[in-house]
């Protein structure tokens, strides 16, 4: 593959420094209007970046979103001995070139893992490629327990030896991972991806049953197969991987971010505006657009664009999160913000993560009427919200507070916005382009 002009070596001092004192100031009462492009999918890019460690060849990854989680993953790859070059930024992301022919590390410390839970994706590739990894327990958003037992049990089934000591997971394999049958007690997206990456270089065939079906898993399969892997079944609940001895160079474009796309459609709905999201795969957001229609939003789809036209006031609707193709848990906080000003009572049930109603406390500061118990929230819509100072508890919850601030009367200040930087590229610019008044201070 020819090297395009303009590529430069990414500096080791990657731009992922946490700035907890930064905040957003959002002016309420605006109707968003216009078009907005969708970035590459965060939840597809992260496992694909980890999968680049599986080959000594060159991995060219287009449409990688320039967000903090990707920056952290790039720095981890540097730490492990990979070389990463970053090209000019496009509308939806950048091109990254990765060469992992000189891996010289197997440890991922707490300074990285506390930043990002997705660092766990490195276990499968490193075990498959070099046979060893020592990794601190992953961090990320504080949205309740996300046990990594699915990952560990699956890797053990493939032949890995795993010990947990002093806050670290130490895993090794004597010679080569061995193909086997794995049944996941829950269709975990991360575990499915980790086991796929581990199994592509294993000896024999691996079958993953009750696998997650998310589009990001289909994208990972496409990336792996372009490297020379033999994976089939992604998008279904049974995935089969025939191990190969070596993988080669690859060029791949990351799919659009369905959560970002759905979030901008929700922004149109809550503000009574009209927003066209460009560069989306419409079927990836079907569960969200169906719910927005139920709430009174007009949805139009054509090609790779989706338009949402919000009503004067939304109607209440019940939401239950489920594994794909059900309603995504990463859109549940945003839907709570919409329900807070809808006409009627909405019942929101969270079945994926525990403790994902933290945004309810902050929405109540703005005048929302929300009662939570366990995994259920009852949201009685109010005619209007009032601007307030609120604290961002996690990535998607922070976006929910921005949506509420756009709808509220007056000015809303959102603190601890470093969470939001983990998942949205050029957020202020995109919202400003749609007519929002939002500033980072």
From Swiss-Prot:
Residues given in the record as UDP-N-acetyl-alpha-D-glucosamine binding sites: 117, 330, 352
Top EC category: transferase
Pfam families: EPSP_synthase
Alphabetical UniProt keywords: Cell cycle, Cell division, Cell shape, Cell wall biogenesis/degradation, Cytoplasm, Peptidoglycan synthesis, Pyruvate, Transferase
Active site (record annotation): 141
InterPro entries linked to this entry: Enolpyruvate_Tfrase_dom, Enolpyruvate_Tfrase_sf, MurA_subfamily, RNA3'P_cycl/enolpyr_Trfase_a/b, UDP_GlcNAc_COvinyl_MurA
Gene3D superfamilies from the UniProt entry: Enolpyruvate transferase domain
Enzyme Commission no: 2.5.1.7
Cellular localization per UniProt: Cytoplasm
Any GO molecular function: UDP-N-acetylglucosamine 1-carboxyvinyltransferase activity
GO biological process assignments: cell division; cell wall organization; peptidoglycan biosynthetic process; regulation of cell shape; UDP-N-acetylgalactosamine biosynthetic process
A GO CC term assigned to this protein in UniProt: cytoplasm
Pathways involved: Cell wall biogenesis; peptidoglycan biosynthesis
Keyword Cytoplasm: yes
Modified residues (2-(S-cysteinyl)pyruvic acid O-phosphothioketal): 141
Domain of life: Bacteria
Reaction catalysis annotation: phosphoenolpyruvate + UDP-N-acetyl-alpha-D-glucosamine = UDP-N-acetyl-3-O-(1-carboxyvinyl)-alpha-D-glucosamine + phosphate
SUPFAM superfamilies, per database record: EPT/RTPC-like
Sites where the protein binds phosphoenolpyruvate: 42-43
Matches recorded under NCBIfam families: murA (TIGR01072), PRK09369.1 (NF006873)
Entry similarity comment: Belongs to the EPSP synthase family. MurA subfamily.
Entry function: Cell wall formation. Adds enolpyruvyl to UDP-N-acetylglucosamine.
Entry protein name: UDP-N-acetylglucosamine 1-carboxyvinyltransferase 1
Gene symbol of the encoding locus: murA1
